């Protein structure tokens, strides 16, 4: 940090941030400035470091756009610094994650919660409107044949789970019928753009004082593809008043 002009002296107020299911995030201060460090999980996977560095490229490309995202400060691509993991530093986000309890303002006012949904749609529209070529992400993904690859890719993912003990198998009711329908109905026309890859309410940060999305987070599945897949996943995972969702209904069939 000192070599990159990021202050001098010890790291203070170190706190591990919760909310993610895999990667490690620490918030700390140095010389009066706050930072968030993000690295791969404690038990690194084969591609954890590559995924972290890929995220930094995406965040750097979003700088200067109107897409709400954490600001990238610095990147360390030398895993030896932390022993085994690359990492990056980003600006802290003043917001909360809706996967936990909502603040009183949001929990008590249905119009604010309604606005949260619209704000998520607005943030996603801003992401989809970014010209990925203009921001330097022309080679960030392989849009040619992207939609055609999705069904085989995810069927293969299910098959790969067979290596884990006690996995009951991929024979989910209706799986092959749905897969066949999707393959018969692949859109013939679509506009490539930045795809978050896991866009739902737990992967955004909301303002503590209103319904606005202040940052889209957890970009490890991002690529160049059809941005409408993000919209579809948002709708599938959106919880109704009774706590149900399309996604939760499917996994309980």
How should these model regions be labeled?
Residues 1-7:
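Juxta-kinase regulatory segment immediately upstream of eukaryotic protein kinase catalytic domains
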Residues 9-15:
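Conserved N-terminal boundary motif of the eukaryotic protein kinase catalytic domain
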Residues 15-178, 185-194, 208:
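ATP-binding pocket architecture of kinase catalytic cores
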Residues 194-196, 201:
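Catalytic-loop of the protein kinase fold
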Residues 217-222:
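Activation of the activation-loop gatekeeper triad in protein kinase-fold domains
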Residues 230-242:
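C-lobe/activation-segment region of protein kinase-like
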Residues 251-253:
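Conserved small/polar residues in nucleotide/adenosyl-binding loops
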């Amino acid at each position: 940090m000192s070599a990159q002009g990021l202050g001098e002296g010890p790291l203070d107020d170190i706190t591990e941030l919760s909310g993610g299911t895999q990667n490690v995030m620490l918030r700390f201060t140095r010389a009066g400035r706050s930072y968030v460090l993000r690295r791969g999980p404690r038990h690194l996977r084969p591609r954890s470091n590559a995924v972290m560095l890929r995220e930094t490229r995406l965040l750097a490309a979003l700088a200067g756009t109107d897409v709400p995202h954490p600001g990238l400060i610095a990147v360390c691509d030398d895993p030896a610094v932390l022993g085994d993991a690359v990492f990056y530093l980003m600006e802290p986000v003043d917001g909360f994650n809706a996967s936990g309890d909502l603040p009183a303002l949001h929990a008590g006012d249905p119009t604010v919660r309604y606005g949260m949904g619209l704000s998520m749609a607005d943030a996603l529209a801003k992401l989809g409107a970014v010209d990925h070529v203009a921001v330097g992400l022309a080679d960030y993904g392989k849009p040619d044949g992207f939609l055609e690859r999705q069904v085989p890719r995810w069927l293969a993912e299910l098959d790969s789970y067979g290596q884990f003990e006690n996995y009951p198998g991929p024979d989910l009711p209706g799986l092959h019928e749905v897969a066949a329908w999707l393959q018969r109905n692949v859109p013939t026309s679509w506009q490539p753009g930045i795809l978050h890859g896991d866009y739902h309410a737990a992967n955004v940060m909301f303002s503590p004082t209103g319904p606005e999305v202040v940052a889209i987070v957890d970009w490890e599945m991002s690529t160049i593809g059809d941005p409408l897949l993000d919209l579809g996943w948002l709708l599938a995972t959106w919880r109704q008043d009774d706590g149900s969702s399309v996604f939760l209904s499917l996994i309980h069939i």
